[in-house]
């Protein structure tokens, strides 16, 4: 017998930064940056977070700055 596919359309992810009208991503805003970091401390990709390319680039720069300044950890505290 042939197997049937199940499922529907997946919902498009919304850019959190654009939806909340955040114009500048500050490296000191660790609460915002933690939303885009995995449990292991890795930067989440665009396909997971739904951010635009422009916002993803500025997010990456802000996260790296915060890590160097000591505001965010490089790895998880496990």
UniProtKB/Swiss-Prot annotation:
Pfam families registered for this protein in UniProt: Ribosomal_S18 (PF01084)
Keywords assigned by UniProt, alphabetized: Ribonucleoprotein, Ribosomal protein, RNA-binding, rRNA-binding
Keyword Nucleotide-binding among record annotations: no
Keyword check for Disulfide bond: no
One term under GO cellular component: cytosolic small ribosomal subunit
One annotated GO molecular function: small ribosomal subunit rRNA binding
Taxonomic superkingdom: Bacteria
GO biological process: translation
Chain's role: Binds as a heterodimer with protein bS6 to the central domain of the 16S rRNA, where it helps stabilize the platform of the 30S subunit.
Stored PANTHER family: 30S RIBOSOMAL PROTEIN S18, SMALL RIBOSOMAL SUBUNIT PROTEIN BS18M
Membership in a protein family: Belongs to the bacterial ribosomal protein bS18 family.
Listed NCBIfam families: S18
Name listed for the protein in its UniProt record: Small ribosomal subunit protein bS18
Source organism of the structure: Lactiplantibacillus plantarum (strain ATCC BAA-793 / NCIMB 8826 / WCFS1)
Classification of source organism: Bacteria, Bacillati, Bacillota, Bacilli, Lactobacillales
């Amino acid at each position: 017998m042939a197997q049937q596919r199940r499922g529907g359309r997946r919902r498009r992810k919304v850019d959190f930064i654009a939806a909340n009208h955040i114009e500048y991503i500050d490296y000191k805003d660790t609460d915002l940056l933690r939303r885009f970091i995995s449990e292991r401390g890795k930067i989440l990709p665009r396909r997971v977070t739904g951010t635009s390319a422009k916002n993803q680039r500025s997010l990456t720069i802000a996260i790296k700055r915060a890590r160097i300044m000591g505001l965010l950890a490089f790895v998880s505290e496990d």
